[in-house]
Amino acid sequence: MSVYFPIHCPDYLRSAEMTEVMMNTPSMEEIGLNPRKDGLSYQIFPDPSDFDRCCKLKDRLPSIVVEPTEGEVESGELRWPPEEFLVQEDAQDNCEETASENKEQ
């Protein structure tokens, strides 16, 4: 019993057919880039003057606005100001308010 099965696939070309394809295909020199109808040639690399103009426009950094979130903090996420600082600050504010109210009376 043989386990060898010949593969008959029409997608693959035999060597003689491939040779014929290679002989009838135009070479890379014949293909070349043709200019467009408006007479301008194709430009593969950017023009250095465009690069200088682009850099001058990027002198300013864009404005980035970050809004604080009021949601729960995920584990491991750092928040500023730390919660301990906020608790201490609130306690100080409450003490100052109480002291000012006592002075007014």
Curated annotation (Swiss-Prot):
Main location: nucleus
Residues recorded as bearing Phosphoserine in the entry: S63
UniProt keyword terms in alphabetical order: Cytoplasm, Developmental protein, Nucleus, Phosphoprotein, Transcription, Transcription regulation
Subcellular location(s) of the protein: Nucleus; Cytoplasm
GO cellular component labels: cytoplasm; nucleus; protein-containing complex
Top-rank taxon, per record: Eukaryota
Nucleus recorded as keyword: yes
Keyword Transcription: yes
GO biological process: negative regulation of DNA-templated transcription; positive regulation of DNA-templated transcription; regulation of MAPK cascade
Domain LBH residue range list: 18-104
Stated family: Belongs to the LBH family.
Role according to the record: Transcriptional activator.
Record's protein name: Protein LBH
Organism the protein comes from: Bos taurus (Bovine)
Gene (UniProt): LBH
